[in-house]
A protein has these predicted regions:
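Catalytic domains of carbohydrate-active enzymes, especially glycoside hydrolases
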Residues: 16-35, 103
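Active-site beta-loop-alpha junctions enriched in small/polar residues
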Residues: 6-10, 33-37, 68-71, 112-114, ...
């Protein structure tokens, strides 16, 4: 078993100290909430990405991937309207590229507020998400990054609220 820890527990101050502590405590990797590293992660420069990758690699840890993908972006919504949906998908596609640049292999899609149905029909949203998540999975395949759907309870969101629904989504996309 490999153990990784999120940077959410530490924040962004004294990041090297955090990496050192993780290694000393027997962790193998780190998961990052990208907006805790950069104000706007997808606008990070090649140099900033290389610096972070080197920093993690030099610590002896593996960069596993990203979670809390849309934490700092309440404007990005899958089901609010078509314009927001397109911007959300584009943003996630850019996060796949960023994750790959850092050597990561997974994006964990929780983002409960960003996947709210906003009163829209569940079946319509489900169909649209199949197409959108397939597009994301295709980009992930090109970059060797997995897009993982995190089922969240109904007290957090109203879309993909059980392991069963998450499993059905994965089977439907079949990627």
């Amino acid at each position: 078993m490999k153990l990784s820890v999120s940077n959410i527990v530490w924040g962004n101050e004294k990041f090297d100290d955090f990496l050192k502590l993780l290694k000393e405590e027997g962790c193998d990797g780190i998961e990052l909430a990208p907006s805790l590293i950069w104000n706007e992660p997808i606008n990070s420069s090649r140099e900033e990405r290389q610096k972070l990758k080197k920093q993690i690699n030099n610590s002896g840890l593996e960069f596993v991937g990203f979670h809390s993908l849309l934490f700092s972006r309440p404007d990005l919504q899958l089901f609010k309207d078509d314009n927001s949906r397109k911007k959300t998908i584009e943003y996630i596609l850019n996060l796949i590229n960023l994750c790959a640049d850092l050597g990561g292999k997974q994006l964990i899609f929780g983002s409960p507020n960003n996947r709210s149905l906003h009163g829209r029909d569940y079946e319509q949203c489900l169909k649209q998400s199949h197409d959108d998540f397939f597009e994301i999975a295709e980009q992930g395949l090109k970059k060797n990054v997995f897009f993982c759907i995190e089922p969240l309870g109904k007290n957090y969101t109203d879309f993909i609220i059980s392991m069963e629904e998450g499993g059905q989504m994965v089977k439907k996309i079949n990627h």
